Amino acid sequence: MMIRELDIPRDIIGFYEDSGIKELYPPQAEAIEMGLLEKKNLLAAIPTASGKTLLAELAMIKAIREGGKALYIVPLRALASEKFERFKELAPFGIKVGISTGDLDSRADWLGVNDIIVATSEKTDSLLRNGTSWMDEITTVVVDEIHLLDSKNRGPTLEVTITKLMRLNPDVQVVALSATVGNAREMADWLGAALVLSEWRPTDLHEGVLFGDAINFPGSQKKIDRLEKDDAVNLVLDTIKAEGQCLVFESSRRNCAGFAKTASSKVAKILDNDIMIKLAGIAEEVESTGETDTAIVLANCIRKGVAFHHAGLNSNHRKLVENGFRQNLIKVISSTPTLAAGLNLPARRVIIRSYRRFDSNFGMQPIPVLEYKQMAGRAGRPHLDPYGESVLLAKTYDEFAQLMENYVEADAEDIWSKLGTENALRTHVLSTIVNGFASTRQELFDFFGATFFAYQQDKWMLEEVINDCLEFLIDKAMVSETEDIEDASKLFLRGTRLGSLVSMLYIDPLSGSKIVDGFKDIGKSTGGNMGSLEDDKGDDITVTDMTLLHLVCSTPDMRQLYLRNTDYTIVNEYIVAHSDEFHEIPDKLKETDYEWFMGEVKTAMLLEEWVTEVSAEDITRHFNVGEGDIHALADTSEWLMHAAAKLAELLGVEYSSHAYSLEKRIRYGSGLDLMELVGIRGVGRVRARKLYNAGFVSVAKLKGADISVLSKLVGPKVAYNILSGIGVRVNDKHFNSAPISSNTLDTLLDKNQKTFNDFQ
């Protein structure tokens, strides 16, 4: 089927043809035949790079041309940004695109001017909770990566969000995009959707297992030169020599960095100098935007054509790595499986060095087939690679046979809803009541009876959990159940002021309850300055930053840091020294409770160092985390501190101003005195303190700065960017030279250095 045959505007057809899309792939043609452009619901369960995004675009374009609005739901912020950039290419045709991934307690009514809105599932759920005005104008919903219904963390929110959208507008078109899963037909039936199920790919995928000196594919072999001890390094070198790129999936962050260091010394020997000079530019940008030892290690690897990628890196470094790989400068990325979760970074060859993952309950366990297929599916760049290869590594023949049977030749597992637990349901029961989707127990049962969980399981199982959630919400004064004035046999459910606020703040009701109880333990106040209060048990509490930081760290919404053996003494000594700052300390004899409390305190200690401007390098060393982890914990605690401030206001206690102040400090990782400076683009906590200490305490002071003084302080390029960012016109002729750094020069010299053996 040719794209010019489709019932979409001619100018958009021209846009696609100009970009090389003239004929639809077979799964795309099948979707059109099944009614994609006729507002029919559709589930496309097809491999990576088989044209799922085009299906979404066509459905959204058709909806917009008919006066509708489209919502594109993604699981990850990074994927939202990627799709937003792609859809912005439709702007010349009058299609406005917006993105929303941020504040989870805002209505974002301004987004309503757009034709396509890109949002994460959590943000979409938040918009529904906050009564966003344009939500009922949505006529087409695209759900990307719908197989994540199977995820314990993200699945329940995605499932309830889809259910709400279909309830809000029964005529909405749902276009669901999925990996190939075992029960795609069941998912399609739940959605009332036609199913496109296909294994077709534009680039052939060869899945195999390396055993000995050959990759063994079903029915064929490929010999690999064993130049190095590490088989994965040999695969990498083989790929680069054939002008391809590699993704290497590891089981841990440490292994990612370790393999990158090992491989980089070998890869550098076969790269052109021109490429290495360009790599040097990326490496120097990594060094200039990082404060940690990890940044130095990453930069050194990048100089040699290899990078590592995981959640412990800061977002700037992850983007630099991704862009360097897309530009075919970085030849190898060693990554944790997070890279396979949605980002569009295909490669000629995918190497899966470890097929086991650590489980805290069961130790090292084999990964699911679906996870393997997601990683393998990254192999083969459409229109660039003649084929793609995914390779598992086996040490013995038995392991080789097992990997072939259990992964290469296996089908992906069925998807199962994770909604049926009190932890998963609690927040959604509250929001369903607060937002008016249900006002009685029966209406609540009916609403959740339309979920995927109810479609797969017996409804009575769900009703039992819903009743448990209701008892909790009623006990915590977040929901009331009252008799109907006219009919005493009818009981109506209502969200209280507390319940409504908790729902809008997008926190777990258990988190809301813990924060409220914490404030009650600290004590109530009618006003005045902060100081010592007496809690309900008669103990003096001195309210400090740590008091509030620990309060939010004690909630289930906050990810706790693990306790290492070396942490117990340090954290316990801190607790003893600061015992008057905690609203509650468990009895040490209750070992499980006390150990959990210590984990909360350790997490709060990290945040305390963050807001008091301890360097990121020192924090990573003190707490054994990555720079990306610091920012992730800061993001979560900022959101929870905002919630605590709002709840303090509702309760009438005096700590809301302290909480709001901490919220700002957590956002920037600095003291309040730097707030004006850290608001300048490109000025973080470190540069802001350097500027402040040099007398540049405000934007006004910076506007009068001598450019030479500023350049000596932060470097010419940064000085230029700062002044430009605050509206100062600067002659940029002095900022264009970019000399090669000593590290880059050393790398080039090492690469070209001759040894005695070269002359034998």
From Swiss-Prot:
Tell me one GO biological process term.
DNA repair
> A single GO molecular function, which one?
3'-5' DNA helicase activity
Q: Which residues cross the membrane?
A: none
Residues that coordinate or bind ATP:
Q28, I46, P47, T48, A49, S50, G51, K52, T53
Intervals of motif DEAH box: 144-147
* Keyword Hydrolase among UniProt keywords: yes
Q: Locate the Helicase C-terminal domain: which residues?
A: 232-426
Q: Which UniProt keywords apply?
A: ATP-binding, DNA damage, DNA repair, DNA-binding, Helicase, Hydrolase, Isomerase, Nucleotide-binding
Xref: SMART domains: DEXDc, HELICc
Q: Residue ranges of the Helicase ATP-binding domain? A: 33-199
EC code(s) of this entry:
5.6.2.4
**Biological role:** DNA-dependent ATPase and 3'-5' DNA helicase that may be involved in repair of stalled replication forks.
Question: What's the subunit arrangement here?
Answer: Monomer.
Could you say which protein family the record assigns here?
Belongs to the helicase family. Hel308 subfamily.
Listed name of the protein: ATP-dependent DNA helicase Hel308
